[in-house]
A protein has these predicted regions:
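Polar, enzyme-active/binding microenvironments
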Residues: 37-173
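Surface-exposed cap/loop segments at beta↔alpha junctions
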Residues: 1-56, 173-178, 196, 209-284
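Surface-exposed, non-catalytic interaction/assembly patches
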Residues: 1-37, 131, 171-195, 259-269, ...
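Short capping motifs at secondary-structure boundaries
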Residues: 281-286, 316-318
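An acidic/polar, Gly/Ser/Thr-rich interaction patch typically located in mid-to-C-terminal regions
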Residues: 79-83, 92-95, 102-118, 188-217, ...
């Protein structure tokens, strides 16, 4: 039987990206900058007492990204003479329920005594000793509004061992199965035309079964999985408490996060689409292999970062989604269909056919500096010269109602790509059939090309545009598949 889990990362939001790490007593091959994000978790070759078994499972340190090894071995009593100290500073203040450590998880070795001091500026907010008893250990102590941690490692659980830390987490991860989840639903959505960038959502109700405090914070990440398949990563947008142990939580995806910060805009000439998207979203995206970079000329007016990303994606001619990964996936929709058979399809499939599009008009823009211009970007005024590119449907009959799609606000569409962009939008709107079918989800992702049964014994082939997922141990998804 499959298993569905929701992992709530009860961590200080954005603290890992905000952290700067320094250390006394770290080995020369340690890359302490990896501590907030995590380094390699390996059984390494070393000269430690009774550590390196000749079983072929230990590997060389040089071939891996080690976050932290101490320079010094602990003594016969497991205590360090010169105690390693790790200092982590932040540019912003953060709050968390404590600090988690991943020590030598490959062998079970761990630091067995440490001290953490939390600071706000020069003020010591908390000072606490901990005695870890596992290679993964949570040092529980709630502290709010701190901007520095000083961690002192006192000793190891076995004598003559290095202190090894693969990751420091500013909080802890809590996983819940369906016994603790009263209800949960996911809506994952994309726009194959890139004329919009929808926000995908997770709404769930959690019933706490243990006497544990929670510190739900905006933008804390939540992962949803069915077995080993990642459905999506979402971020807390708000919550309500309806009983002592019952919480209703609303979450959105990375595009929802981008919608809450502004982009100042700019004017660009032959700017790499990939580098411009990186400037907007901060590198939290991947581009699939079939997508080639392109150069864009035009402007982005001041707007939210989600709106700015949409401008780039549309002019680039690609799609984006957040399902099935941590971050944004930039891709071209699949063209080789995989079949979703009747064994995974519930009864009640339907097909809706949209009205014929009689023409598409796309407005291209050219921006030149002009003191009397109508566009203001960063305090500089620009004149916007526009050109309209049209593609007309040659198969329109006398009985067809006029239905013209007009795209006027795509400010990164220049004259060089105006006609090809109009053709691309026209081609998209020739796909008029939307098949709605409820399926047993098996890892399908937005943009996948699939063939699904319809209500009259045939099939419809197209790309997945939307999935409304009701979470249980068997995951059912109401899919919308757009085809010809």
């Amino acid at each position: 039987m499959s298993k569905t889990t929701i992992t709530y990362k009860d961590v200080a939001p954005e603290a890992a990206d905000d952290a700067s790490v320094s250390a006394n007593g770290a080995s020369s091959f340690s890359d302490i900058t990896r501590l907030p994000g995590g380094g390699s978790e390996i059984a390494a070759i070393s000269g430690e007492l009774n550590y390196w078994a000749l079983d072929g499972k230990h590997v060389a340190v040089d071939d891996n990204d080690i976050a932290f090894w101490s320079t010094e071995l602990s003594g016969a009593d497991g205590v360090f003479v010169n105690k390693p100290v790790i200092t982590i500073t932040f540019t912003q203040q953060h709050s968390s329920m404590g600090v988690s450590f991943r020590f030598d998880t490959a062998t079970g070795g761990h630091v067995n005594s440490l001290n953490i001091k939390w600071y706000q500026g020069t003020t010591l907010k908390a000072n606490k000793d901990f005695t870890p008893n596992n290679a993964v250990y949570f040092c529980e102590h709630t502290v709010t509004s701190y901007d520095k941690l000083v961690i002192t490692l006192n000793g190891t659980n076995l004598p003559y061992r290095y202190a090894k830390i693969s990751q420091i987490i500013f909080g802890l991860y809590r996983s819940f199965g369906m016994t603790a989840i009263r209800s949960a639903s996911v809506v994952n959505e994309m726009d194959g035309s890139a004329l919009s960038v929808p926000v995908s959502t997770l709404r769930w109700t959690l019933e706490i079964r243990d006497n544990v405090e929670y510190m739900f914070q905006l933008k804390q990440p939540v992962e949803v999985r069915n077995d080993n398949k990642l459905i999506g990563v979402y971020y807390i947008d708000g919550y309500s408490r309806t009983a002592e142990s019952v919480y209703n939580l609303d979450c959105y995806d990375a595009f929802g996060v981008l919608d809450e910060s502004n982009f100042p805009g700019g004017v660009y000439t032959n700017r790499s689409a990939k580098s411009l998207l990186d400037e907007i979203v901060g590198g939290h995206f991947t581009v699939t292999s079939e997508v080639a970079d392109t150069n864009l000329t035009g402007a982005i007016l001041p707007c939210t970062r989600r709106e700015a990303a949409q401008q780039v994606l549309f002019a680039w001619g690609v799609c984006a989604s957040t399902d099935g990964r941590d971050g944004i996936r930039v891709f071209s929709p699949g063209s080789t269909p995989s079949a979703i058979g009747t064994g995974r399809t519930y009864s009640g499939a339907s097909v809706e056919v949209a009205s014929i599009v009689t023409a598409v008009k796309v407005t291209a823009h050219a921006y030149t500096q002009d003191a009397n211009g109508s566009v203001d970007i960063g305090g500089t005024r620009y004149k916007d010269t526009t050109t309209v590119y049209t593609v007309t449907n040659p198969d329109v009959t006398a009985t067809d109602k006029p239905n013209v799609v007009e795209v006027t606000g795509a400010t990164l569409v220049s004259a060089a790509i105006g006609q090809s962009t109009a053709q691309r939008v026209y081609d998209y709107y020739q796909r008029r059939s939307t098949n709605r079918a409820k399926i047993v989800w098996d890892g399908e992702m937005l943009g996948d090309s699939v063939t699904v049964p319809n209500a009259w014994g045939g099939t419809t082939t197209g790309n997945v545009q939307k999935m409304e997922i009701k979470l249980s141990n068997t995951v059912a998804a109401n899919c919308e598949v757009l085809g010809v």
